[in-house]
Amino acid sequence: MAKRSMNRLVKSLLSVMIAAPLGFGTMETQAETAPPVQEWSFDHEQPGVLPSQFFIGTMFDGRPAGEWQVLATDRAKSPPHVLAQVMAKGAEHAYKITLVKGIVAADLNLAVSFLPIQGQADMGGGLIWRAADDRNYYLARANPLEQNIRVYRVENGIRHLLQNFNQTIDVRRWHTLRVTHQGCRMNIFYDDKQVFDLCDKSFHDGMIGLWTKSDAVTYFDDLPLQHMKSTHTRQ
């Protein structure tokens, strides 16, 4: 009698394990409901022009904020194309900006790969997010000349430094900047290494974009955006 009861118990446990092995069923459900990723690789865009979904901001003196265009190059991270800022001149506070039309993101996971090409006054580039316009946004940027990574809050065209991280940046290879932002909490990664974890409550949502400064010429590639489900109330 005891043996039959034990056999029934074993069969019952086996049926549960087969139906939901090690909780993978739950993981699969989460994956199915994960927010989709929107990505710009620029590989199907026409070289020599700006992709139609992007627009160029305005510099402090009213001129277009850089010369942004798709380039065909064998230096692309994911060939054949990159999005490049090619204006190789500019004043100290000439911020070269391009933003994506029709995107309003609050909580997000955003990344881009960049390759520093040239620059004497400045070099490198960065990510813009939660942008109200081309003068109000968050910015994470990497500068090979200064050998650092910084995150800023930009208000009315003026940068306010939030944090600095000293980092060796090799100009001969591609690098990646990534930001996750939920509520006020932002985490920023450089080549998969976390460099910032901070809270700022200035901007709640907005556009995304790319950024360079002064005379920096930079290639950008593989720009993925994932809208994240909010776990915070607006603060």
What are these model-predicted stretches?
Residues 31-60, 221-222, 231-235:
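Extracellular carbohydrate-recognition regions
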Residues 95-103, 163-169, 209-210:
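Beta-strand-rich interaction surfaces with strong enrichment in secreted/lumenal proteins
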Residues 127, 201-218, 234-235:
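Predominantly extracellular/luminal carbohydrate-interaction, adhesion, and secreted-enzyme modules
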